[in-house]
Amino acid sequence: MIDVSDPENPVFAGCYSEDGYSHDIECVIYRGPDSRYTGREICWGYNENSLTLVDITDRSNPVQLSRTVYEGVAYTHQGWLSSDQRWALLDDEADETRSADK
C-alpha cells in the first residue's frame, strides 16, 4: 500500500501478502450488512484460488477477516461488490475449461 496524500512524495504505508498472488482487489469503506465492520476499510482480494477479505484500516497491521474457496475454482480473476455491499460478484477466468461433471 502506498500513501499518496502528497502525490509528489509517495510513501510506503504497509503490505498484506499472507494469501499469495492477488489478481484484483477492491477496497471500500464498508457500509454493508455486518455492523462490526461499518466505517472500516475492507479489501476484497480475488487471489487466484480464493476470495480473501482483509481489514486495512490500520495499514501497518492489516488483518485477514476471511478466506473463501469454492468448488471448481480454476482462476479467481476479479469481482465487484453490489451497491449495498451485500454481494460480491466473482469472475473465475478459467472455470469454463472444466466440464460440469468433473
Predicted regions and their residues:
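Feature marking well-ordered beta-strand scaffolds used for ligand recognition
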Residues: 1-102
